[in-house]
């Protein structure tokens, strides 16, 4: 047992040393490492001699490496959304005018209120950008609590297996955490004011019906949609290796 433990510790130290080196090098170049680069580093490690291919030692050490890779990937996703224009400047996740008031907004734009429409859209995205850092703790907790079976499922799953895992495990809790903070942020950045201004100017116009919208719910859900989309895009970087490499990694870990 002592020999096995020693070999496992040495293997873990090698993984951590590789990751530390990648992180230090990336810091020097002002860039975070990609998930792909970390997984390639782990892939190059020799198989554990303590239990052969697919041993518990292999699974634990490589599992730790996958967790670290996911930690880096989710951090990159959160950081990219947290900056100025993280949502607003990214067409894939930009929060657009809600469908329920889009007709009102279209009419408003055509009759001189484009400024109010633009302010409303911008303020929703600014609120999402301000709230995005909240997700970091939830990702960290989910990664920490991953079981070996969770890691196995992510390794053998589809292109967004980890993202699906996070969404299933976290979305409800994230919604609960995000909504009150976003409600506050929406008010701070003027989304509610812009919305009321936009709707208020047209609610008495004969050809426009008064519309209603749970703005906090809308912005919260759209913020989370954008968050998981971005994590999914980051995860796909893991899956871009040639099939042989992926198979080699799976053989190293699971003996397949």
Q: In which residue ranges do the predicted regions lie?
A:
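Short, Lys/Arg-enriched N-terminal segments with co-localized hydrophobic residues
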Residues: 1-11
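Sec-dependent N-terminal signal peptides
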Residues: 15-24
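Sec/Tat signal peptide C-region and signal peptidase I cleavage site
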Residues: 26-30
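N-terminal Sec/ER secretory leader and immediately downstream segment
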Residues: 33-121
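A cross-kingdom marker for long, charged
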Residues: 34-47, 216, 223-256
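Residue-level signature of catalytic and energy-coupling elements of molecular machines
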Residues: 77, 147, 242
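Mid-length scaffold segments of soluble, non-membrane domains
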Residues: 112-185
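An amphipathic alpha-helical core segment
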Residues: 181-222
């Amino acid at each position: 047992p002592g020999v096995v433990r020693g070999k496992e510790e040495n293997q873990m130290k090698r993984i951590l040393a590789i990751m530390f080196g990648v992180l230090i090098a990336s810091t020097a170049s002002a860039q975070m490492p990609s998930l792909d680069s970390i997984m390639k580093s782990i892939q190059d490690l020799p198989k554990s001699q303590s239990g052969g291919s697919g041993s518990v030692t292999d699974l634990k050490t490589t599992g730790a490496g996958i967790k670290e890779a996911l930690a880096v990937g989710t951090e990159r996703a959160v950081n990219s959304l947290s900056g100025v224009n993280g949502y607003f400047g990214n067409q894939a996740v930009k929060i657009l005018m809600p469908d329920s008031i889009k007709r009102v907004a279209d009419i408003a734009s055509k009759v001189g209120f484009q400024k109010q429409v633009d302010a409303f859209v911008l303020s929703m995205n600014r609120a999402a950008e301000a709230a995005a850092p909240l997700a970091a703790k939830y990702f960290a907790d989910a990664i920490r609590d991953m079981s070996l079976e969770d890691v196995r499922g992510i390794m053998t799953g589809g292109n967004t297996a980890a993202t699906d895992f996070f969404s299933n495990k976290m979305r409800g809790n994230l919604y609960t955490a995000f909504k009150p903070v976003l409600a506050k942020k929406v008010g701070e950045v003027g989304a509610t004011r812009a919305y009321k201004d936009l709707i208020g100017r047209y609610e008495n116009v004969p050809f426009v019906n008064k519309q209603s919208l749970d703005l906090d719910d809308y912005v919260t859900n759209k913020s989370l949609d954008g968050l998981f989309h971005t994590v999914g895009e980051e995860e796909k970087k893991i899956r871009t290796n040639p099939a042989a490499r992926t198979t080699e990694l799976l053989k190293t870990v699971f003996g397949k």
